């Protein structure tokens, strides 16, 4: 039965140009965003990270030290400490109040992704997954055989922190049980997505599902309990949505899970800076909102602050956009990821506990 749900209806309330006057002409792409209730960290294509005060969007500090592209940033929860990883083969730990780098962690390859579980730092280093203890400043473990190409994302499970998921250009999604001492036993699932994976995220009431976005803009969902595919939304979802809604979809950015409504939201856009917001249901992808009249180029990042009901976006036009959600009521089938898996299509891939290279 159709249920009335609150529609996401984002309206722009502010935007800023990502530049620092004192450093001259340093306007640049914003490659990654990290946000706390009070701070916003924006990593630029000029290898600088700028720290903004969210109350007035003024710049508090500029973090300088990386020598190559900054791929991901993470705040340590409830602190002003920021971690950043880079293609310069380092992770840097920053005091955002002073702007100083307190530690540099050197690795053997480019670091494309990081995630945190207390003192444990997970890194995607080249084709390896490396675990590092921030307290002892020592590497504690590495998985160097689970992937054959660059690891693009590492993510700790939101509830079961002993579980870690990685994805790679090699098309594999690996789930690890870090309580297992033996590396082979620790690899719970090796899933072949048959496509280079660029982004992943958890969803479901117990975060028992995973979404994947490939570098070819393909969306799929997976059951982490079984390692089986739930749904693949088509080889050319962009064209499907463009034809259905009569506007251009050139790329997808990421998905955000709203646990209050149990809904998975997909963000995409066009090359002229218009963003599109979609509801991912068990059977299809439904357009529910637009992000208009702020950006003029590709949108790189979205961050949804559910507590402040604010969406933050960054783009290749050097702008950071701030959007307020003004909900309206629409008649759309509400997604229920806990009860509707039996409605989802077949086309499942079995998980493999054998060699991850058997494709």
UniProtKB/Swiss-Prot annotation:
Gene3D superfamilies in alphabetical order: YVTN repeat-like/Quinoprotein amine dehydrogenase
WD repeats: 23-62, 65-104, 106-144, 146-186, 192-232, 294-333
Source species, domain of life: Eukaryota
TM spans (from-to): none
Keywords, comma-separated and alphabetical: Repeat, WD repeat
SUPFAM superfamilies for the chain: WD40 repeat-like
Alphabetized PROSITE patterns for the sequence: WD_REPEATS_1 (PS00678), WD_REPEATS_2 (PS50082), WD_REPEATS_REGION (PS50294)
Annotated protein name in UniProt: WD repeat-containing protein 89 homolog
Organism (species): Dictyostelium discoideum (Social amoeba)
